Structures are given as C-alpha cells and as structure tokens.
Regions:
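Short, charged/polar micro-motifs that form catalytic or ligand-binding hotspots
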Residues: 11, 15, 27-39, 43, ...
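Charge-enriched, short contiguous segments at helix-coil
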Residues: 92-148
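A broadly used, surface-exposed interaction patch
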Residues: 5-8, 15, 53-108
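Polyanionic, low-complexity intrinsically disordered segments
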Residues: 135-216
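Generic structural signal for well-ordered, non-membrane alpha-helices
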Residues: 23, 47, 108-112
Length: 216
C-alpha cells in the first residue's frame, strides 16, 4: 500500500467533480476495503466517460448527440448502461481502441468482484484500476481528434444555422471549440479553416466566409 501514490494520482484529476468520488476510493484504499474501492473506481470511470459524452452532445456534435440519446433511452428503460457508455465513448473517439479493450477487461473483473464469495480483491487489483481510471479519463479533458475537427467544421459549413448571429455569441461559440482542440492539432484546424474560407469566397457565401475569418 502506498498512500502517497494515490494522492499523486489525485493531483492529475482535471475535473473537480471527479475528485469527490475519488476521495471515497482513497478512503477505501487506506482502510483496506479493496472490493468497495474497486467497485467505486468502476463507477467513477463510467460516470466520467458519460459526462464527456454529454459534454460533446451539448456542443452539438452529431455523434455525441446520437450516443447520448441512446444511453438516455436505456436509462429511461431502467437498463444497465455501463457497456453502452464504454462503446459510445469509443464511437465518439473519447477513448482509443486499446483503452476500450482495457476497460472491457476491467468490466470483467468488476463482474467477478461484485460477488464477494467468488474471489478476494487484492490491493494490487485496486491500484491497477485506479491507475487505469486516471490514465484513461480522469487526467484527460475532453478533446477533439483530427477526424472530429474536420467533421465539426464540415457540419458548420453544411448547417450554417448553428452559427450564432451575434458576433459576441460567435466568439463564445468559437472559444468552446478551441478549448477542445489540442495544440498539436492546430495545423489540421487551420488547414481546414482556410480551405472552407476559400470555398466560401468562391461561392460568395458571406456568412460562412465571415465566420471562418473570425475563427482564424
């Protein structure tokens, strides 16, 4: 057991809301309640991914909205959504294929550990899921992949009604997008912005052209 280690993991958490449940996991860890800690860690993993899907949907992302509607419908029907949330997170590129495989492995262990007479939960089991929980989602803010950046701009161009009319609202709209784009993806962003600006000028589409200039 390494108390300092779990505290270091906590320092990597991006969202303060996640820290609340993480503190309960730490309490389980300190008190050697490894089974309870494991199950709480699984819950936090799923809830963190779910929040990112909702966040993506709130930004009018088509895949985010589709996946969230599916999850929401399952919740309304009182169905288990853990596996669907994981799959939806992969579909929205919130997690990679490798991370999806890791989460499936954690899910299988969670199902075993949920039955107290089947297998003892060791400190190493709890440490493992905590490390993956932090690596896969808690330490990562929601961000857009290259493909998602291209899709977002394509959606804006083909559905210009989503562009706010007020210039200040346009600025806020753009800031919401930029927060989700990593610096390493800026070249992809600007390449697409200049491409759509050129096309808008050729088509005399002043609305799109003005928006692209503001974005740039």
């Amino acid at each position: 057991m390494d108390i300092n280690w779990v505290e270091i993991q906590k320092s990597q958490i991006c969202n303060n809301d996640d820290a609340i449940l993480y503190n309960e996991i730490v309490a389980c860890y300190k008190n050697k309640l490894y089974r309870s800690g494991y199950l709480l860690a699984w819950i936090l993993l799923i809830e963190s991914l779910k929040r990112k899907i909702i966040e993506l949907a709130s930004l009018d992302d088509s895949r985010g909205k589709t996946e969230w509607q599916l999850i929401e419908q399952m919740e309304q029907n009182h169905q288990s959504t853990d596996c669907q949330i994981t799959l939806s997170a992969k579909e929205c590129e919130i997690i990679s294929d490798t991370e999806f495989t890791t989460i499936n492995s954690l899910w299988q262990q969670r199902c075993i550990f949920a039955h107290p007479y089947m297998q003892e939960v060791k400190v190493s089991d709890l440490e493992y899921i905590i490390s993956k929980l932090v690596d896969i989602t808690l330490s990562k803010p929601l961000s857009l992949s290259k493909k998602m950046i291209e899709e977002r701009l394509d959606e804006i161009v083909n559905s210009p009604h989503v562009i706010p009319v007020n210039p200040d609202e346009q600025n806020n709209f753009i800031k919401q997008q930029l927060v989700l784009i990593k610096e390493k993806h800026y070249p992809v962003l600007y390449k697409n912005l200049f491409f759509y600006l050129s096309k808008a000028r050729e088509a005399n589409n002043n609305t799109i052209a003005a928006f692209m200039r503001r974005y740039i």
